[in-house]
């Protein structure tokens, strides 16, 4: 499946990534992307920036190297109440919010605890996508959470770095099952490289293969085209971005 948008990338601002936004944009262009989301880790992750960093993304140009830039964040799920570590004042300056479990922030627990947290994240309304859900350290009720995500138009991320098998070990088969359930429930799927170095931006080959094997319809993959991604943002209640009228 062709994927023209990468919704999960990091710059050196995350504290453990190694490229600038301009370097990421250059690689995105070389790798055939039309658009990507810049989604550095939010402040509870060791080494991550203060929330002002995310609020000030309003100064970023909408295109770098002729690639569209989506202003985003990978926030941390903090507790079972579904709170995330982004100050509410930042929301108006962001286009895209991922919420993910990370071991340094949320101590792995049991299925019931993780499920409760994810359901409350979804219902809280601030989050557009759930990141790298395949991690076996954060097992959850796939059916219940993905059904809730489908009902609230929250996208399920399939993460290319996870599928390489070196990070979040034990996730690959779980990602296939998550994709199968998302297909059955009619949930939206998003695709992220989770690049921590510029050459990986737009590296979505393993995700593309998975989606093909599972038989997910491209109409439910919001990263199939920039038009589909922007339509999803509007569906989520976000304002249209004037500079992206070129994609209409």
UniProtKB/Swiss-Prot annotation:
Zn(2+) 2 binds at residues 16, 41, 196. One of its GO terms (biological process) is bacterial-type flagellum-dependent swarming motility. CDD domains: PHP_HisPPase_Ycdx_like. Keywords: Hydrolase, Metal-binding, Zinc. It is an enzyme of class 3 (hydrolase). HAMAP family: YcdX_phosphat. Binds 3 Zn(2+) ions per subunit. It holds the Pfam family PHP. One of its GO terms (cellular component) is cytosol. Belongs to the PHP family. GO terms for molecular function: phosphatase activity; zinc ion binding. Its EC number is 3.1.3.-. This is Probable phosphatase VS_II0429. The lineage of its organism: Bacteria, Pseudomonadati, Pseudomonadota, Gammaproteobacteria, Vibrionales. Its cofactor is Zn(2+). PANTHER family: PHOSPHATASE YCDX-RELATED. Zn(2+) 3 binds at residues 74, 102, 132. Zn(2+) 1 binds at residues 8, 10, 74, 194. It comes from the Bacteria. It comes from Vibrio atlanticus (strain LGP32). SUPFAM superfamilies: PHP domain-like.
